[in-house]
Each structure stands twice: as C-alpha cells, then as structure tokens.
Amino acid sequence: MRMIDIIEKKRDGKSLTKEEIEFFVNGYTHEEVPDYQASSLAMAIFFQDMNDEERAALTMSMVNSGEKIDLSDINGIKVDKHSTGGVGDTTTLVLAPLVAAVGVPVAKMSGRGLGHTGGTIDKLESVKGFNVEISEKDFIKLVNDNQVAVIGQSGNLTPADKKLYALRDVTGTVNSIPLIASSIMSKKIAAGADAIVLDVKTGSGAFMKTLDDAEALAHAMVRIGNNVGRNTMAIISDMSQPLGNAIGNALELKEAISTLKGNGPKDLTELVLTLGSQMVVLAEQATSLDEARQMLIDAIKTGKALNKFKTFLSNQGGDDSIVDSPEKLPSAKYQVEFKAKKDGYITEIIANEIGVASMMLGAGRQTKEDVIDLGVGIVLNKKVGEHVEKGENILTIHTNTKEIDDILYKLDNSITIESKGEAPTLIHKIITE
C-alpha cells in the first residue's frame, strides 16, 4: 500500500477502506508517513468529507494507536459526558455527583484548562488537599464504592490524535467535521466509556459558531459512537453568553455547591438536568428522560446529591467542610463592581471575551507553565435579556490587583445594552442519531 495512492483516492472524492485508514494512522504515529503527506490527506478530507464508515474507522484507528483505559472492573454502564468547551462551564462539577447519587457510575478523566476555558481539575484543586493523581486501582475502587471519582489525564492515550491535531492547527484543516468528530470521540472511547453524552456548544463562546455547524458535528459524533458500539446522545446548547454566573475556579466551585443545594442559576440547573437525564437513561437507571429528570430533581431536594459531593471530595483528600462553609475557598482581595452606563436590556455578553478577561485576572493559563490564581474571576449579576438601570451592577470583578483598566476596557466592549432584548434559547436540540 502506498500513501500517495490513498491521498489521490480521497482527493478524487472516493471512500477509503478501513485498511487504508489504518495504514495512514499507524504510519503517521510511527513517523513512517511524513507531515507533508499527512497534511495533504487532511486537506483532501477537508474538501471531500468522509462517510460514516470512514469516520468510524478513523476514530478506532486513533483509539488503537496508544493505551486504552480498561474500566471493565467497574460495575454498571460507564457513561461519560463531553462538552465541546465554553466559558463558565461548571456542568461537570454538578453533574458528576448528581448522577452518581442516582446510581450512575462516573469514572471521569479530566484535564487542566488552557486559554479562556478552565479545566475541571483546576476548579477541583480550589479545594484544599484534593488529589487527582491516584492509581488506576484506587480510581476503580472509588467508583465502585461511591459511584464517582476524577483522575488526571493519562499520558499515552490516542497519540495519533495528538499528532494529527497539532498538524491540523498549522495547515488550515481544523474546521473539518470528520476530523473534529473523530478526534473528540477517539479520546472518549480510549478513556473507557461504554456510553457517551455530548454537549455541543454553539454561539460566540463556542468552537461551532452556527447552529448548522453544531448540528453537523453532533450528528457526526453520535453516529460514530453508535457505529462502534457506544450508545451516544448529544444536545446542542447555547454558548453565546457564559453559562451560569461565575467564571473562575473557586467562584465556579461555589456556584456548583449552590446548584447542588437547589439554589443554582437557572441556565446551569436546566443544562445539568437535561444532560443528566440522558446519562441516567444510557446507564439504564431509568427508562425515560422524564423519569430520569425526576430522579435527579429528587436527589437535589433530599440532599443526596450534596452528600455525594462531600464524600467525593473527602475520598480524594479534599476538605469537605467547604460544602457547608464555601467562604473557606480561596477568594480575591478586591471586588470591583462593573456598572451599567445606561438603562435598557442586555442584548449581548460575549462569552469568550468574558473568558479572556477572567484569564487576564489570573483565572486561566496563557501557557501550560502558568500558575492559576484560584480565587479570582468574574461573577455576572445580570444575563442577556434582563433589564438594567444606569448605575446598576452588571457584574463583579474578583481581583488581587487594583490595576485592571485593560480588563474594564475589555468588559466595556463585551457587553451591549439596547432598548429591547430577549434571553437566548439554552437548549437548541437533542440529537440521538
């Protein structure tokens, strides 16, 4: 088999066989296929697309390129949730203990944040003593005993994806549905999930800016999952403004705790119940989404979900007293109010700009080496569609420095007030095929 023949075949719009895709992925992983041929094939895929069989083959070739996490010793159906990323996306912190409280095993592998999106692990490390560097054996035992545990990402999962991702970044082939879908799904499958729930974001703070693109990606990932024996569902949710009210590590953890107590922001609570219902159904703990939703609402009302979160924290060395006393979490020295300059309705809060402002305060990393300031960030007091009066506080900046003119300038350009406005739709679609 020759790489040039595979490139020409795809260039001419023909379908590649499973063997041809495996030949490319194995060759590229082991440096037998040079970058220039790999980028040529990526560009051919970008223009000619791939059918469902090709996408499934590409995904599984990337899964098989490295180590795989074996979670077969965990009882029950392991359901993983993946979000395509956003700003203030606190869902995992609420979802994991919530679905665990109704019997869904959550074996979560999480990363750290880079850029304007915070990683789940950064948020959890706001809790004194919390440790994600646990052995696979301990991880499995924790999930069997308590239904939920979080571990840091392992080094050698999907090396083919890492190489291809870096190449796409510099060759103009990032925005290709088959390449994005296989990249995301290969990581989830290699991490041992039996079933997968996807939260595909759309809007200004999302990778997929338009609803059509988000829908195409959601369908692609759901089909890949179902074609390789992993039950998969997706929802398309709004990320034109930040999710919930808090952006920043300890601030988001406080918000997660109040959501588990039943006092969280409306949008975060709704998204968690929608995603959680799918996880409960895929884990076969309920037969319908309505039944699953009611189970989750009850787990919040009775305090079961909150207790599960406490146990989860203490199991991994964390100080669980922060659940009852969130003021023990890291906090910033100063709180600066950002006030409305006129009366009207908020029509826009640009999600990624708010994320960047939060990163500039120290809540995110610009490079992998950066140390995060866990206490800083931004808390929204108003959301899109809400009325404000001149001089009313729109958001509060939690900062450890008084030198924030550049941040105030950025916020000024990220929030729009007009004479009328309405709240965006939170959940656009549910995709099951």
UniProtKB/Swiss-Prot annotation:
Cellular-component GO terms for this entry: cytosol
Upper classification of the organism: Bacteria, Bacillati, Bacillota, Bacilli, Bacillales
GO molecular function: 1,4-alpha-oligoglucan phosphorylase activity; deoxyuridine phosphorylase activity; metal ion binding; thymidine phosphorylase activity; uridine phosphorylase activity
Keywords of the record: Glycosyltransferase, Metal-binding, Potassium, Transferase
EC number(s) from the headed UniProt entry: 2.4.2.2
Quaternary structure annotation from Swiss-Prot or TrEMBL: Homodimer.
Gene3D superfamilies: Nucleoside phosphorylase/phosphoribosyltransferase catalytic domain (3.40.1030.10), Pyrimidine nucleoside phosphorylase-like, C-terminal domain (3.90.1170.30), Transferase, Pyrimidine Nucleoside Phosphorylase, Chain C (1.20.970.10)
Residues that hold phosphate according to the record: K81, H82, S83, T92, K108, M109, S110, T120
UniProt source species: Staphylococcus epidermidis (strain ATCC 12228 / FDA PCI 1200)
Reaction it catalyzes: uridine + phosphate = alpha-D-ribose 1-phosphate + uracil; thymidine + phosphate = 2-deoxy-alpha-D-ribose 1-phosphate + thymine; 2'-deoxyuridine + phosphate = 2-deoxy-alpha-D-ribose 1-phosphate + uracil
SUPFAM superfamilies, per the entry: Nucleoside phosphorylase/phosphoribosyltransferase catalytic domain, Nucleoside phosphorylase/phosphoribosyltransferase N-terminal domain, Pyrimidine nucleoside phosphorylase C-terminal domain
Residue numbers binding K(+): G88, T90, L243, A246, E255
GO terms of biological process kind: pyrimidine nucleobase metabolic process; pyrimidine nucleoside metabolic process
Superkingdom in the source lineage: Bacteria
Classification via InterPro entries: Glycosyl_Trfase_fam3, Glycosyl_Trfase_fam3_N_dom, Glycosyl_Trfase_fam3_N_dom_sf, Nuc_phospho_transferase, PYNP-like_C_sf, PYNP_C, Pyrmidine_PPas_bac/euk, Pyrmidine_PPase_CS
Protein name: Pyrimidine-nucleoside phosphorylase
Gene that this polypeptide is encoded by: pdp
Similarity remark: Belongs to the thymidine/pyrimidine-nucleoside phosphorylase family.
Presence of the UniProt keyword DNA-binding in the record: no
Pfam family, one: PYNP_C
Cofactor section: K(+)
Cofactor binding: number and manner: Binds 1 K(+) ion per subunit.
Binding residues annotated for substrate, in chain numbering: R168, K187
Entry annotated with the keyword Glycosyltransferase: yes
Function recorded in the entry: Catalyzes phosphorolysis of the pyrimidine nucleosides uridine, thymidine and 2'-deoxyuridine with the formation of the corresponding pyrimidine base and ribose-1-phosphate.
